[in-house]
């Protein structure tokens, strides 16, 4: 088992210190900034991706991973809940303990992992620009028809 942390940021020294404090140097790899091709390879080789974010506008990492068939374990916040279909393409959890429990559950259950991998690919297919545009037009068209007034009338 190996944990790969991708990206750079102000918390890197804290992560390195924690990894050293728990003796994780042999199984935790701080990849730093990676190219798009390297990121895709990491997604494809991962059993899951994880996010403990407390705020997220959109779970782009979760969406990118899903497109590679990689399920997510993430905190149940708005951005993640938009990107992940709970118990279909990943697990949405509450808090640090929930994240730890969710990761243990996913990593320890091959059947669950396989089911969520398939669900991740299906969810990613729903998150294309074309699919989003069609869904938005359907909502607009339905609303327009429901609120239409006879020709020649004005106001409510």
Q: Each predicted region: which residue ranges?
A:
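Nucleotide-activated donor-binding/catalytic signature segment of Leloir-type glycosyltransferases, i.e.
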Residues: 14-34
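Short alpha-helical donor nucleotide-sugar binding micro-motif in glycosyltransferases
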Residues: 33-34, 41-46
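A short hydrophobic beta-strand element within the catalytic core of glycosyltransferases
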Residues: 49-50
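Aromatic "clamp/platform" in nucleotide-sugar-dependent glycosyltransferases that forms part
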Residues: 54
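Short hydrophobic beta-strand element within catalytic cores of glycosyltransferases
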Residues: 62, 71-74, 84
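Conserved acidic donor-binding segment of nucleotide-sugar-dependent glycosyltransferases
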Residues: 86-97, 105-110
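A short, well-ordered alpha-helix in the C-terminal region of glycosyltransferases
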Residues: 112-126, 135
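C-terminal alpha-helical cap of glycosyltransferases
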Residues: 129-156
């Amino acid at each position: 088992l190996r944990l790969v942390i991708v990206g750079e940021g102000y918390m890197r020294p804290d992560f390195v210190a924690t990894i050293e404090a728990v003796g994780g140097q042999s199984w935790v790899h701080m990849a730093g900034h990676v190219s798009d091709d390297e990121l895709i390879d990491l997604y494809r080789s991962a059993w899951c991706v994880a996010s403990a974010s407390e705020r997220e506008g959109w779970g782009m990492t979760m969406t990118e991973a899903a497109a590679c068939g990689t399920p997510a374990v993430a905190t149940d916040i708005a951005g993640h809940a938009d990107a992940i279909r709970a118990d279909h393409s990943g697990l949405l959890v509450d808090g640090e303990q929930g994240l730890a429990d969710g990761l243990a559950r996913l990593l320890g259950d091959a059947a669950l992992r396989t089911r969520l991998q398939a669900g991740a690919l299906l969810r990613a297919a729903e998150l294309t620009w074309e699919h989003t545009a069609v869904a938005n037009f359907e909502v607009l068209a339905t609303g327009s028809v429901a609120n239409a007034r006879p020709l020649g009338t004005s106001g409510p």
